From Swiss-Prot:
Entries under Pfam families matching the protein: GMP_synt_C (PF00958), NAD_synthase (PF02540)
Coiled coil: none
Binding residues for ATP: S28, G29, G30, V31, D32, S33, S34
Designated name of the protein: GMP synthase [glutamine-hydrolyzing] subunit B
Protein's organism: Methanococcoides burtonii (strain DSM 6242 / NBRC 107633 / OCM 468 / ACE-M)
Amino acid sequence: MVKVEKFIPNAIDRIKEQAKGKTIIALSGGVDSSVCAVLAYQAIKDDLIPIYIDTGLMRKGETERIKEIFADMNLQTIDAKDRFLDALVGIKDPEEKRKVVGETFIRVFEEEAREINAQYLIQGTIYPDRIESDGGIKSHHNVGGLPEHIDFKGIIEPIDDLYKDEVREVAWALDLPEEICERMPFPGPGLSVRIIGEVTEEKVDVVREANAIVEEELLEQFKPWQTFAAVIGKGTGVKGDVRVHGWIIAVRAVGSRDGMTAEALELPWETLMKIESRISGEIASVARVLYDLSPKPPATIEFE
């Protein structure tokens, strides 16, 4: 486990050594980027410019929540929803989606960096991200999903040797609020990797609502490592007396220590039935709801 009393000053010194001037950070509101933001602010103060990109692929209410939490950090918010959705048109391959999101993400940051004359980028890459990218399991938008040519002088990754549970320890030591310290992992490419096949605005809207329902039903009571819903295709259903061809939603809830391995939670039947009833009842275009029992390995936690 990480020794936070040593890690924190070492990370601050590392940022001071690498960031030589205006530096931007990709702030998502997750524990990884939030820890990096606090460390960076302690290291370089007003040379840090936190930027949040609204990709249109975030969870329900997430953008508004992030604006509230980080209002005192001079947070700059960029509305890039149309840009990301346009870039994803026609793309079905999971790795291509990740790379498109990563490239669009970094290009938006480059544009902002030029506006403010920033030459360095801080990112919240953690150790499992590097393992999965280096091992060819999947690229991460802030690791293997980045374009080969980046216009920054350097990318700084202060927590790239930590596992998720260690990042949470550092977050508590930095006095970050519990909402951030215990925030559930969320993939860098956002809801795009919770949609099998091409990403469309309709699918994003469906999976966003389904995710919100799953989180409402499971987070507080069962405290999963990660839980979410994914749109995995279309299937036949019946709404009233009418035959429909609607979306199939897969629900995922896993327990884990560090994200490297995971087991599906054994949820009560009544809970699963309630989730199914809410999703199919509140989202008119959904025809079927499934529960994924796959462990990691052989599956990954996310569907893509």
